[in-house]
Amino acid sequence: MNEIIVRNLKKNFRGKVALDIPSFESYSGEIVSIVGTNGAGKSTFIKIISGLMLQDAGDVFVFGSKNTSKDIHNNVKLVLESGRGYYEYLTANQNIDYFLHLNKSSRSQVKDELEDLFNKLAFHPYVDVLVSELSQGTRQKLSLIIALLCKPKVLCLDEPTNGLDVIAKKQFAKLLLTLSQEKGTIVLMTTHDIYFAKEISTRICIMSRGKIIQQGSFSEIFGKNTRWIKYRIGISDSEKDAFERLFPDLSYQVENERLIVEVKDSQLKNNIFNNFEIIFFEEVEESIEEILYEVINDD
């Protein structure tokens, strides 16, 4: 059964199309990563599903409630990027108490759940720290804790791994997987972190210019890649003529008397190594924009 149903969704900003999504559905326990370049409409999409922003046309139903109704906030919680929206000069604990009060709850009612979240996200050292002194990643944790205390059926996350270190990402991934698998929570997540998306997603949606242009499992869209890297190789610019003869189709740049070329194919990298003296070399992770460009243009 599809618990999120979107039909003929449209949103414009100043006459420009921000969203144009004819159809989208999601079901309990699904983790959907929404990826795309900046300005693709990712954040706008989850804000509309959560009821924080309203569409110009179309319908959004979440567990039977329209996103325009007050009931939507009982089912959906949105965690914004960088943990914004808290009282800077209250502690983390004081902010938690305040938001519990807004939701007509109290610490005594959620004592066990709160302790469990503190443990899973290693949050105990920060409970009495002012929010103004928390790092971006720790604010993200606070945002997630407050959202989950409301026991949402749908959790919308906007770039949730920004500011998180490797250990925090693993804690975060484990928690989201537990929510989806044991409680059936739907997680809709915008992200530029392709490796995090690979680890936890049941489905990937690629957005471009306000449209969902491709969706499927991670392997269906990105193949079996485990890393996306390119090689930056430098040789002496005195070897320019020889390089152009051997590799006429490769472009390059000249920097500080070095000829710099970028390649992604390891065999091509080895061919360059075998034919020239290498004076500079590094592996560089590709950006999400570069990865998506390759995926979209391979279709």
What kind of feature is each model-predicted range?
Residues L155-E159:
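Catalytic Walker B motif of ABC-type/P-loop ATPase nucleotide-binding domains
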Residues V263-D299:
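C-terminal coupling/interaction segments
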Residues L175-I260:
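ABC transporter nucleotide-binding domain
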Residues S50:
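Helix-to-loop junction immediately C-terminal to a conserved catalytic motif
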Residues G58-N74:
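Conserved ABC transporter NBD signature motif
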